[in-house]
């Protein structure tokens, strides 16, 4: 892949896993495996549509051959400790952003009126910052389902910061990333509308 192709893939390839969609959202929030399966299909379809629309809107990538960099062989005694250290760094990176945005969300709740803290707009605000906090604050209703689909498409600022921290150590930029996630959130909302009569009759 070229650098430009990698940056275009970033616009739609960073998505929630099926375990979160089926378990936390479907079974946990809506108490329905059908709702979880619907959210999963909506999530995947919105990502693919966002990718197609993004690539269609951008100029074509010039075809050509790219130099192949062969990986330097490492001895097991050096590769194994490095792998463990890199895994720990990745876990700490994820945990740090999750904790930061969760605390930030709770601080916001502390200063907001109590009536707003239990409302759908508040859940959307929490989900904009940190996905899990927002999803778990949603009501089990049609509006909650639509909001859940949109938040899953967006991903949350916590996830975006995790992605940007990884990109900082690579030659890739995030020029298409946030636009792609915003588009995916909108498409997720639109794709969730036809599912409402079947899930919430």
Where are these regions (language model features)?
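Generic transmembrane alpha-helix signature in multi-pass membrane proteins
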Residues: 10-11, 19-29, 132-140, 161-168
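Helix-coil boundary and interhelical linker segments in multi-pass alpha-helical membrane proteins
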Residues: 27-36, 142, 197-201
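Intrinsically disordered, low-complexity non-transmembrane regions of multi-pass membrane transporters
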Residues: 59-85
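Transmembrane helical segments that form the transport core of multi-pass membrane transport proteins
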Residues: 80, 84-152
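C-terminal transmembrane helix pair
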Residues: 19, 48, 144-201
């Amino acid at each position: 892949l070229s650098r430009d192709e990698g940056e275009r893939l970033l616009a739609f390839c960073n998505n929630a896993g099926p375990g979160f969609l089926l378990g936390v959202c479907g079974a946990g929030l809506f108490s329905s495996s059908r709702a979880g399966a619907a959210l999963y299909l909506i999530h995947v379809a919105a990502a693919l549509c966002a990718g197609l629309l993004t690539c269609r809107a951008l100029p074509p990538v010039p075809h050509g051959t790219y130099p192949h960099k062969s990986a330097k062989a490492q001895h097991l005694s050096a590769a194994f400790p490095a792998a463990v250290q890199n895994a720990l760094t990745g876990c700490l990176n994820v945990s740090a952003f999750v904790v930061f945005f969760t605390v930030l969300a709770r601080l916001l709740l502390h200063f907001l009126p109590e009536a707003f803290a239990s409302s759908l707009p508040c859940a959307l605000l929490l989900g904009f910052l940190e996905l899990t906090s927002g999803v778990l604050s949603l009501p089990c209703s049609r509006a909650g389902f639509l909001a859940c689909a949109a938040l899953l498409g967006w991903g949350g600022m916590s996830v975006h910061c995790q992605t940007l921290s990884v990109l900082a150590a690579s030659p890739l930029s995030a020029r298409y990333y946030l636009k792609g996630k915003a588009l995916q959130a909108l498409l997720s909302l639109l794709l969730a509308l036809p599912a409402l009569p079947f899930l919430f009759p």
